[in-house]
From Swiss-Prot:
GO terms for molecular function: metal ion binding; phospho-N-acetylmuramoyl-pentapeptide-transferase activity; UDP-N-acetylmuramoyl-L-alanyl-D-glutamyl-meso-2,6-diaminopimelyl-D-alanyl-D-alanine:undecaprenyl-phosphate transferase activity. One of its GO terms (biological process) is regulation of cell shape. PANTHER family: PHOSPHO-N-ACETYLMURAMOYL-PENTAPEPTIDE-TRANSFERASE (PTHR22926), PHOSPHO-N-ACETYLMURAMOYL-PENTAPEPTIDE-TRANSFERASE HOMOLOG (PTHR22926:SF5). It holds the Pfam family Glycos_transf_4. It is a multi-pass membrane protein. It catalyses: UDP-N-acetyl-alpha-D-muramoyl-L-alanyl-gamma-D-glutamyl-meso-2,6-diaminopimeloyl-D-alanyl-D-alanine + di-trans,octa-cis-undecaprenyl phosphate = di-trans,octa-cis-undecaprenyl diphospho-N-acetyl-alpha-D-muramoyl-L-alanyl-D-glutamyl-meso-2,6-diaminopimeloyl-D-alanyl-D-alanine + UMP. This is Phospho-N-acetylmuramoyl-pentapeptide-transferase. Pathway: Cell wall biogenesis; peptidoglycan biosynthesis. It is found in: Cell inner membrane. InterPro entries: Glycosyl_transferase_4, PNAcMuramoyl-5peptid_Trfase, PNAcMuramoyl-5peptid_Trfase_CS. The chain crosses the membrane at residues 24-44, 72-92, 100-120, 134-154, 170-190, 197-217, 234-254, 261-281, 289-309, 336-356. It comes from Hydrogenobaculum sp. (strain Y04AAS1).
């Protein structure tokens, strides 16, 4: 919206010319999304805390007993994150390109699935069934993948990091590939969201790294110089990536230890879908594995735990999965686990950006 305002007013007021630049709008996105989250969160917390107390509170069943004290901490704080992202993208991204609207739809769709689950948990602690939850994600991801393929006509090649020209064309199977990325990423973020402040910082660092790469991929000169695949209008995705950073900072203000609110499934599923879409639309699907390495490890720990338990009929690799609970049961304080994972996520983001030259 502001992009077009800049085009209209630049001939009358020179300062409005800066609204044409992606870098300036990305900076504004950080500030706007941060302020929206910071201002609305206290109001939201008061409302949801009252609901939590009315229905007896909620804490995940698959957590250590020490988490029982968090039962009245308001969940669904991710609503504010998603609202902030949607408003920031509509305000600051170009509205004449498919990327803006497909991103907005995908994030909103996954967030709705998470919100329904969170809302049901207020009365029924188990939430909606796993089958219903997965069905919702499949429907949203299929629509998003179809929009990418049939409307945006996205390139169906997969480009491999560290290689200049290695690529694989999936053709129609790219639709299924997109669905797998969106569902896997959203659920991986959901699994990671188990300690105060744990999931939001890796989400921010992943979005930042993918935002930087999106900017490069959308700039024909930089893309040619660094020998990565050029994607028309991908630079606009950098604005969304920076909005995730701003909204994340605002949320972390209240989510850091001891947490005053949690993001809930509405936040984790929505954020996961956002990260997946950033990677997909910038043609960095495989780079997401590096940038979001924390989420990959957390998800793998659950897969390993469940698989070994079923195969051996009762044996476990970890004391509890996801792996952050294993560290917790080993006696490592929650804040120390969280900060260490933050450090790892920052290093992964740095390495992800470095892959631009490592090819």
């Amino acid at each position: 919206m502001l992009y077009w305002l800049g085009l209209v007013l630049k001939s009358h007021i020179f300062l409005f010319n800066v609204l044409r630049y992606i870098t300036f709008r990305a900076l504004i996105a950080v500030i706007v999304s941060f302020l929206i989250t910071l201002v609305l969160s206290p109001i939201f917390m008061r409302k949801v805390t009252a609901l939590n107390r009315l229905y007896g509170g909620y804490v995940r069943e698959d957590t250590p007993e020490t988490h029982s004290k968090k039962k009245f901490v308001p969940s669904m704080g991710g609503l504010i994150i998603i609202l902030s992202l949607e408003l920031s993208s509509i305000l600051l991204m170009r509205l004449d390109i498919a990327q803006t609207w497909i991103m907005a739809f995908t994030v909103f769709g996954f967030a709705i699935v998470g919100f329904i689950d969170d809302f049901v948990k207020l009365k029924n602690k188990k939430g909606i069934s796993a089958r219903s939850k997965m069905l919702g994600q499949i429907i949203v991801s299929f629509v998003s993948a179809s929009l990418l393929y049939f409307v945006m006509h996205i390139d169906t090649h997969i480009y491999f990091p560290f290689f200049k020209s290695l690529k694989l064309d999936l053709g129609y199977f790219y639709i299924v590939f997109v669905m797998l990325i969106l569902i896997a990423t959203s659920n991986a973020v959901n699994l990671t969201d188990g300690l105060d402040g744990l999931a939001i910082v890796p989400a921010m660092t992943t979005a930042f790294a993918l935002g930087i790469i999106s900017y490069v991929a959308g700039n024909s000169i930089l893309a040619r110089y660094l020998e990565i695949h050029y994607v028309e209008n991908a630079g606009e995705l950098a604005i969304f990536g920076m909005a995730v950073v701003g909204a994340g900072l605002g949320f972390l203000w209240f989510n850091s230890f001891p947490a005053q609110m949690f993001m809930g499934d509405v936040g984790s599923l929505g954020l996961g879908a956002a990260l997946g879409m950033l990677a997909i639309m910038s043609k960095q699907e495989l780079t997401l594995i590096i940038a979001g390495g924390v989420f990959v490890v957390e998800a793998l720990s659950v897969i390993i735990q469940v698989s070994v338990f079923k195969i051996t009929k009762g044996k476990r690799v970890f004391k509890m999965a996801p792996i952050h609970h294993h560290f917790e049961l080993n006696g490592t304080p929650e804040p120390k686990i969280v900060v260490r994972i933050w450090i790892i996520s920052i290093l992964l983001a740095i390495f992800t950006i470095a892959t631009l030259k490592l090819r």
